[in-house]
Curated annotation (Swiss-Prot):
One of its GO terms (cellular component) is mitochondrion. This is NGG1-interacting factor 3. Transmembrane segments: none annotated. Keywords: Mitochondrion. It is found in: Mitochondrion. Belongs to the GTP cyclohydrolase I type 2/NIF3 family. The lineage of its organism: Eukaryota, Fungi, Dikarya, Ascomycota, Saccharomycotina. PANTHER family: NGG1 INTERACTING FACTOR 3, NIF3-LIKE PROTEIN 1. May interact with NGG1. Present with 6000 molecules/cell in log phase SD medium. The keyword Thylakoid does not apply.
Length: 288
């Protein structure tokens, strides 16, 4: 049975998303954001008019997540990362599992919206969530975006964050806070200090970027003690460590996934939508 909703219902959901994460914030120079699969219909029934749109939130739209949406009778998947990336010139489901998933979702009438860098850049978006998680939202002297969005005057609208604490925090405490807010049992840390000395290593200024921070960190204009991101190249990690800096990397999607449960779910529920967070979505890398 088709899960397709009316155009009016889908438009309402898109308005709810863009209310918090406007499309103009997305980095269109490379990112593929917005409504990537539109299965809405012009036909309206009494049941349609009274029904809530059921939304599944996920970071990555994989085959297992798509099946989860089908099984849960969801109408729309909001996938943080762009599902169609880079652009497709043809569909070949026999050689590309993403193409197979797209065809399946269309057959079931499930639409897909991907906000990605619009959420990265928004005030109150994923980067501000990461900043709050460093010390429970307390002790922040100042914070601003490392790379602002063109045309915006608010210095908290943009990619990445610089944050300075009122009072130093030990690396040991920051690592504990990061693992708690990201819901991960481990992170990777590069530091000249041995782990036994992390309680003595004080952190006051931090560069933060969800996902991959390498490009955004090039916009830094102030010196920092700590670089905190999802992933960074080996040579960059080595460079910062040799310069006496500390690096925390957590795997790309681990810096984004908890935001769906902690922030986005509640915002969309308050807008009148039924929202569930995927249980199948997970970082593709595990420790063996």
């Amino acid at each position: 049975m088709s899960r397709a909703i009316t155009r009016a219902q889908l438009d309402k959901l898109v308005r709810s998303i863009t209310k918090f994460y406007p499309q103009k914030y997305a980095d269109k120079s490379w990112d593929n954001t917005g409504l990537l699969i539109d299965c809405s219909t012009a036909q309206v029934t009494t049941a349609d008019a009274n029904a809530k749109t059921k939304v599944l939130l996920t970071v990555d739209l994989t085959k297992s997540v798509a099946q989860e949406a089908v099984d849960a009778n969801c109408n729309v998947i909001v996938a943080y990362h762009p599902f169609i990336f880079p652009s497709w010139n043809r569909l070949s489901p026999h050689t590309n599992p993403q193409h197979e998933t797209a065809i399946k979702l269309i057959q079931y009438g499930i639409s897909v919206y991907c906000p990605h860098t619009a959420v990265d850049a928004a005030r109150g978006g994923v980067n501000d969530w990461l900043v709050r998680g460093l010390n429970n939202g307390e002790n922040v002297a100042k914070s601003y975006a490392l790379e602002t969005v063109s045309g915006e005057t608010d210095d908290l609208i943009g990619y990445g964050r610089f944050v300075e604490f009122n009072k130093d925090i030990s690396l040991e405490q920051i690592v504990k806070n990061v693992k708690r807010v990201l819901r991960v049992p481990y992170v990777q840390v590069a530091s000249l200090a041995a782990p036994s000395a992390w309680n003595q290593l004080k952190i006051k200024k931090v560069a933060v970027c969800a996902g991959s921070g390498s490009g955004v960190f090039k916009q830094l204009k102030e010196d920092v003690d700590l670089y905190y991101t999802g992933e960074m190249s080996h040579h960059e990690v080595l460079k910062w460590k040799e310069m006496g800096k500390t690096v925390i990397v957590c795997n790309h999607s681990n810096t984004e996934r908890g935001f769906l449960q902690d922030v986005m779910k509640g915002l969309l529920q308050d807008e009148g939508h039924e929202v569930v967070v995927s249980k199948m979505d997970c970082d593709p890398l595990t420790v063996a």
